Regions:
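N-terminal subdomain of lithium-sensitive/metallo-dependent phosphomonoesterases centered on the IMPase/IPPase/PAP
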Residues: 1-104, 160, 165, 280-291
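Generic detector of well-ordered alpha-helical packing
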Residues: 65, 69, 88, 103-106, ...
């Protein structure tokens, strides 16, 4: 049976009790992640990796460009009327329904041989993320969600060289449904952050927040937010992000029962920064970060 048929035939019990109108798009996004993983893994720790510097002084590798180009090619063939927003090759097409691509989130980790990097893929319709995939083959994990369909993780992705098991097992037992934590107070919370740079006027409030938490760790990038979705971390905060850094994360966190906003509390991934949390302590985190502004 084809992956598309398997997903569209899933009962409400296998989708967490909710049907989804975006089953076909989610399955397609998973095939995009398969293609991305095959390219990125083939270039990970490659001795001939090509690295250049973009105008914003951030690095880009030949793997970033190859992954994004492959995803664009596939989207254009499958959904020719959809728009595309990519980190490396810019924007094109429809602004009511478009795909957002971060070919390798964590490029600095990728080029140094640190396994914390991923391909982020999201579909936006009428300014709402409706399907998303975060695939991290070097960590052997893939997270995915569709609007109203819940959020899941497949573990073991990448062990065979591709992520095809995520599709094969989508209607089976290998996927694990995600649910955020139930922590109610900052004093009991585990907080993940990117780094100490970029906080500007919020720097003092940021440091005070970390001091008041039960635990804090500098993880950063997609990894922090996926741990929020898994319930392993209660809060993830980052002071400066682009849309392609956040779009795929937003839906997965929210479908796991959490909340995703800008530091100023605006819902969704369209601000310049992000807080993701279990939702229960979101207001307290936002207030704490804005106290020193």
């Amino acid at each position: 049976m084809l992956a598309k048929d398997r997903l569209e035939g899933m009962s409400s019990s296998t989708t967490g009790g909710a049907s989804t109108a975006y089953a076909a798009e989610l399955t397609f996004a998973l095939t995009l992640a398969d293609r991305a993983d095959a390219i990125s893994l083939s270039r990970y720790q490659a001795l001939d990796l090509e690295i250049t510097t973009k105008p914003d002084n951030t690095p880009v590798t030949d793997a970033d460009k190859s992954v994004e180009a492959a995803i664009i090619e596939a989207i254009t063939a499958q959904y020719p009327n959809d728009g595309i927003v990519g980190e490396e090759f810019g924007s094109r097409g429809d602004k009511n329904r478009y795909w957002i691509i971060d070919p390798i989130d964590g490029t600095k980790n990728f080029l140094r041989g640190v396994p914390t990097w991923a391909t982020l893929i999201a579909l936006v319709e009428n300014e709402k993320v409706v399907a998303s995939v975060v695939s991290s083959p070097a960590l052997y994990r893939r997270w995915f969600a569709s609007k109203g369909g819940g959020a899941y993780v497949i573990e073991g992705v990448g062990l065979s060289g591709t992520g095809s098991d995520a599709i094969k097992d989508l209607a089976g037992t290998a996927k694990r449904k995600l649910s955020v934590s139930k922590v109610l107070q900052i004093a009991d919370a585990s907080i993940a952050y990117s780094d100490f740079q970029g906080w500007g006027a919020r720097r003092a409030s940021f440091e005070k927040l970390l001091d008041s938490a039960w635990r804090s760790r500098g993880m950063g990038d997609f990894w922090s937010h996926m741990l929020v979705a898994e319930g392993a971390v209660d809060v993830a905060i980052e002071p400066s992000l682009a849309l392609w850094d956040m779009a795929a994360l937003d839906l997965i966190v929210c479908e796991a029962g959490g909340k995703f906003t800008s530091l100023d509390g605006v819902d969704g991934p369209f601000g310049p920064n992000a807080i993701s949390s279990n939702g229960l302590i979101h207001a307290a985190i936002s207030a704490a970060l804005n106290g020193g502004k």
